[in-house]
C-alpha cells in the first residue's frame, strides 16, 4: 500500500511541476517573437515638421532546412544546412533632401523581398 502512495506522490509532484511551468510561460505562441509586421515607420532623425521621412521596418520570414545531397555535390564548400530569408524593403520610394544637402530615400510602400544588406 505504501508503494502506491509513493507512486501517487511522484505523479502528483510531476503534475504540479508541469502546471507551474505551464503557468509561468507568458500568454501567446511559443514561437512568436515581439516583431511587428513589415510596414512604414517614421524616421525621427531625418523627419522635420511638415516633411516626415519614412523607412520600412519590421519582420518577414526566415527558415533553414537540410541541404539536399544533390545540391551539396555541386558546392565548392558543401554545407549541411541551407537558409533562406526575406527582409522588409521599400517597394516604392521618392528621393528627399534633408538637413540642407543630405539625400535620402523616403519610402512610400513596403513589402517582404530579397535582403539587400549583403548585396553591395
From Swiss-Prot:
Signal sequence bounds: 1-24
Pfam families, per database record: Hormone_6
One GO cellular component term noted in the UniProt record for this chain: extracellular space
S-S bridge residues: 35-59, 38-88, 56-110, 60-112, 87-115
Gene3D superfamilies assigned to the protein according to its UniProt record, in alphabetical order: Cystine-knot cytokines
Residues glycosylated per entry: 80, 106
Role according to the record: Shared alpha chain of the active heterodimeric glycoprotein hormones thyrotropin/thyroid stimulating hormone/TSH, lutropin/luteinizing hormone/LH, follitropin/follicle stimulating hormone/FSH and choriogonadotropin/CG. These hormones bind specific receptors on target cells that in turn activate downstream signaling pathways.
Subcellular location: Secreted
InterPro entries found in the cross-reference section: Cystine-knot_cytokine, Glyco_hormone
Quaternary data: Heterodimer. The active hormones thyrotropin, lutropin, follitropin and choriogonadotropin are heterodimers composed of CGA, a common alpha chain described here and a unique beta chain which confers their biological specificity to the hormones: TSHB for thyrotropin, LHB for lutropin, FSHB for follitropin and choriogonadotropin subunit beta/CGB for choriogonadotropin.
PROSITE patterns per the UniProt record, alphabetical: GLYCO_HORMONE_ALPHA_1, GLYCO_HORMONE_ALPHA_2, GLYCO_HORMONE_ALPHA_3
Protein name, as recorded: Glycoprotein hormones alpha chain
MF annotations from Gene Ontology: follicle-stimulating hormone activity
Single biological process term from Gene Ontology: positive regulation of steroid biosynthetic process
Family: Belongs to the glycoprotein hormones subunit alpha family.
PANTHER family tied to this protein: GLYCOPROTEIN HORMONE ALPHA CHAIN (PTHR11509), GLYCOPROTEIN HORMONES ALPHA CHAIN (PTHR11509:SF0)
Family annotation (SMART domains): GHA
Main subcellular localisation: secreted
Keywords: Disulfide bond, Glycoprotein, Hormone, Secreted, Signal
Amino acid at each position: 500500500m505504501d508503494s502506491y502512495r509513493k507512486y501517487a506522490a511522484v505523479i502528483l509532484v510531476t503534475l504540479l511541476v508541469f502546471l507551474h511551468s505551464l503557468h509561468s510561460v507568458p500568454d501567446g505562441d511559443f514561437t512568436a517573437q515581439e516583431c511587428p509586421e513589415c510596414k512604414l515607420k517614421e524616421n525621427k532623425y531625418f523627419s522635420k515638421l511638415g516633411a516626415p521621412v519614412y523607412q520600412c521596418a519590421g519582420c518577414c520570414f526566415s527558415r533553414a532546412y537540410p541541404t539536399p545531397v544533390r545540391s551539396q555535390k555541386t558546392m565548392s564548400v558543401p554545407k549541411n544546412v541551407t537558409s533562406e530569408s526575406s527582409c522588409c524593403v521599400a517597394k516604392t520610394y521618392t528621393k528627399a533632401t534633408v538637413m540642407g544637402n543630405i539625400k535620402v530615400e523616403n519610402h512610400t510602400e513596403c513589402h517582404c523581398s530579397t535582403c539587400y544588406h549583403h548585396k553591395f
